[in-house]
Amino acid sequence: LENPLFGTVLDVWMSLRGDAIAPPWRVEDLLRYPVIVIPFISVVDVTPNGGFRYRFWGTGHVDVKGYDYTGHSPLDHEPPEYGRMINDEYQAVADAARPMAFVHDIRPGLTEISKYQETLRLPLANDGRTVSGVISFA
C-alpha cells in the first residue's frame, strides 16, 4: 500500500485492541485516529442475519463518491457487482478476524471514470472475541 497513513491507522487500531482479537466500536475512539483520516473512515456493523450495515460513512467518501451510505448495506452500492465485491471484502475480514488490505477501482457513478482506491479494513469486536463490525480507511 502506498498511503503512509495506513501504518498510522493500523497502529491506532492495534493500541485500541489490547489483548482482544479486535477493539470494540466506541465513537470516542474514532477521535484517536488522525483528523485527516476521519473523513475517509467507514464503519459497518454485522447485522443479526449476518449481513453488514453502515453505521458511519465519512464525509470524504461523500465528497469522492457522491453518496452517503449511512444506514445502508454494502450491497446497495452501484453497480451491483461493486456492491458484492465490497460486501465480500467485509465478509473476508469478519471471517478471518484480522486486518486486510484491498486495492481496486471505484466508480462513483455508473457513467463516471473509475478511480484507484486502496482500502484497509480492520475488524471490530465489541466483546473482544467475536467480530461485530469492520472499520475501514480508504
Q: Whereabouts are the PLM-identified features?
A:
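Intrinsically disordered, low-complexity terminal regulatory regions
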Residues: 1-77, 84-138
